Each structure stands twice: as C-alpha cells, then as structure tokens.
Amino acid sequence: MRIGHGFDVHAFGGEGPIIIGGVRISYEKGLLAHSDGDVALHALTDALLGAAALGDIGKLFPDTDPAFKGADSRELLREAWRRIQAKGYTLGNVDVTIIAQAPKMLPHIPQMRVFIAEDLGCHMDDVNVKATTTEKLGFTGRGEGIACEAVALLMKAAK
C-alpha cells in the first residue's frame, strides 16, 4: 500500500462561478488560477501522483504551458489516473477536505463524489468529500480564498 497527500490553495478574484470537485458553484467571486482553479481536484490529483511517486500536478501539467490555460481539472485528474494505472496501481480510497468559509459546500458534495468516482472508475464508497471552515480565522476565514487537502491510498494491482 502507498499513501499520498495533496494540498492546494486558490485566492478569490474576479467574478464567479467557481468549480470545486468538478461541480460549478454559483458564487459572486471567482478563483484566480491558470486552469479552472478546482482546488479539490488539484489536491486530489497531487495526492494520487504522490502515492505513485509521479511528482505533482505542477510537474505533469505546468502552469507555464499555455496548453493548460483554463484546463478542465477533471481531464487532468483522468490523465494522471491513467498514468498511475499504467504503473500498476489500483485505488484503495480517497478522502478530500475542502476548507472554505464560503460558499457552503454541503449541497454540492454528493455530485463531487459522483464526478470523482466516475473519473477514477471506482465505487462511490471509495470516495469521501467533506468540507469545513476555519471559524473565520486565517485567509480562508477572511474570505480570501479556498484551500483543500486530500489523501489517497493506492495498492499494487494483482498480477
């Protein structure tokens, strides 16, 4: 078994909506990013890549490459997952924690789980997504941005 951890942050800027966990969420602010700014899928992709010792999302999809300008993070996740499977790994489970004072994530979590399970080709029981606030402390609490942490467990596929 191998475990990976991912973390991502994006500052608010411009106008919404935002995309979190592949879900378009109405919000008055947007997120500043080279791609679509999906902190949940970026953290998850990093966790998966880390568990497989394949570096990180910035190495695989550099923000200096114009090809990834405005990229759909679901596509990035699927490409990373293909590379991980090519190394002979299967998924144990993933757990994602979104850290945001606003907007509220709870109504969107079921669809996030559906999208992640689809992208990883796994059962929804292998995908957990939750959200928390920082009780108005720090940059997320002040409404300056959104953060996310994720962990992923991989196993070598049986031969």
Curated annotation (Swiss-Prot):
Keyword Calcium: no
Highest taxon above the source species: Bacteria
Catalytic activity: 4-CDP-2-C-methyl-D-erythritol 2-phosphate = 2-C-methyl-D-erythritol 2,4-cyclic diphosphate + CMP
Biological or metabolic pathway of the protein: Isoprenoid biosynthesis; isopentenyl diphosphate biosynthesis via DXP pathway; isopentenyl diphosphate from 1-deoxy-D-xylulose 5-phosphate: step 4/6
Keywords: Isoprene biosynthesis, Lyase, Metal-binding
Residue numbers binding 4-CDP-2-C-methyl-D-erythritol 2-phosphate: 8-10, 34-35, 56-58, 61-65, 100-106, 132-135, 139, 142
Sites marked Transition state stabilizer: H34, T133
Molecular function per GO: 2-C-methyl-D-erythritol 2,4-cyclodiphosphate synthase activity; metal ion binding
Enzyme class: lyase
Annotated EC: 4.6.1.12
CDD domains reported in the protein's UniProt record: MECDP_synthase
Entries under Pfam families matching the protein: YgbB
BP GO terms, sorted: isopentenyl diphosphate biosynthetic process, methylerythritol 4-phosphate pathway; terpenoid biosynthetic process
Cofactor(s) in the UniProt record: a divalent metal cation
Positions with a binding annotation for a divalent metal cation: D8, H10, H42
Cofactor info, note text: Binds 1 divalent metal cation per subunit.
UniProt-listed InterPro entries: MECDP_synthase, MECDP_synthase_CS, MECDP_synthase_sf
Function according to Swiss-Prot or TrEMBL: Involved in the biosynthesis of isopentenyl diphosphate (IPP) and dimethylallyl diphosphate (DMAPP), two major building blocks of isoprenoid compounds. Catalyzes the conversion of 4-diphosphocytidyl-2-C-methyl-D-erythritol 2-phosphate (CDP-ME2P) to 2-C-methyl-D-erythritol 2,4-cyclodiphosphate (ME-CPP) with a corresponding release of cytidine 5-monophosphate (CMP).
Subunit field text: Homotrimer.
Family: Belongs to the IspF family.
The protein's name: 2-C-methyl-D-erythritol 2,4-cyclodiphosphate synthase
Lineage, highest ranks first: Bacteria, Pseudomonadati, Pseudomonadota, Gammaproteobacteria, Enterobacterales
Protein encoded by which gene: ispF
